[in-house]
């Protein structure tokens, strides 16, 4: 049950999940993720799927408080400047290390092109890596809800994205299909091993995850979207 609380309840838990204590969990919800590109669509099912694979600088817990995720700490050096300490020892599911430059790349990607999440962080005027694995974010004025906004911005591997032609977010509204709209590779607790749009998505445990694997006993999650509920 710890897994359900940590990974689903804080994020619009509208699905039906069973059995709770099995190594394989079958998960149903009304509708499917529209895309696997974590910046291409800002809507519930897409975020639900992305959160199993991708992570943010900060996250929300069951009581909706902000907690560290890929950033271990943060501070404001002035009302318009935030400095985030990036967590050491984190690797993407392909084994490559998370770097401050991946965070910079991801935030800039989320701010540009056809990204559907740019409105969430449009107060950001610049983002850069500094020293000691830190990232500095500047805003166009004091922004007391920046942490809440950043909790919805997922961090991608810069190298993986560029290798696969995904430097820019998928243009979902133009029906564009990219490698990153049908594949995913993040730092989260699961990896996607099968993707059948609107039919079935299979997630398997990411053994390289930096978090506490004892928080859940799941080896696999099978998402079976209930498309008929959309029309009720």
Task: Name each model feature, range by range.
Residues 1-9:
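Bacterial N-terminal signal peptides that target proteins for export
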Residues 16-22:
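Sec/Tat signal peptide C-region and signal peptidase I cleavage site
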Residues 23-31, 72, 81-85, 103-107, ...:
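Short, well-ordered beta-strand elements
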Residues 28-77, 108, 183-187:
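N-terminal lobe/hinge region of extracytoplasmic solute-binding protein
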Residues 65, 153-216:
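Gly/Pro-rich hinge or "lid" segments in bacterial periplasmic/extracellular proteins
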Residues 72-116, 130, 136-138, 146:
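Aromatic- and charge-enriched surface segment that lines or borders ligand/interaction sites
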Residues 75, 119-169, 196:
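Surface-exposed binding/hinge segments that line
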Residues 230-232:
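Conserved small/polar residues in nucleotide/adenosyl-binding loops
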């Amino acid at each position: 049950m710890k897994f359900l609380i940590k990974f689903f309840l804080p994020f619009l838990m509208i699905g039906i999940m069973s059995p709770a204590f099995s190594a394989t969990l079958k998960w149903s919800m009304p509708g499917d993720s529209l895309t696997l590109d974590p910046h291409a669509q800002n809507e519930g099912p897409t975020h639900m799927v992305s959160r199993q694979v991708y992570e943010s600088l900060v996250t929300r817990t069951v009581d909706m408080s902000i907690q560290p995720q890929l950033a271990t700490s943060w501070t404001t050096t002035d009302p318009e400047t935030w400095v985030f300490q990036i967590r050491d020892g984190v690797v993407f599911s392909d084994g490559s290390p998370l770097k401050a430059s991946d965070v910079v790349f991801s935030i800039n990607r989320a701010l540009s092109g056809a990204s559907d999440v740019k409105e969430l962080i449009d107060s950001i005027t610049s983002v850069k890596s500094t020293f000691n694995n830190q990232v500095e974010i500047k805003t166009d004025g004091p922004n007391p809800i920046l942490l809440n906004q950043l909790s919805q911005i997922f961090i991608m591997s810069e190298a993986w994205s560029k290798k696969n032609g995904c430097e820019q977010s998928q243009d979902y509204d133009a029906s564009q299909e990219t490698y990153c709209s049908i594949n995913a590779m993040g730092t989260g607790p699961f990896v996607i091993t099968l993707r059948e749009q609107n039919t079935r998505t299979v997630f398997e445990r990411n053994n390289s995850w930096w978090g506490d694997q004892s928080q859940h006993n799941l080896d696999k999650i099978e998402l079976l979207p209930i498309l008929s509920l959309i029309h009720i």
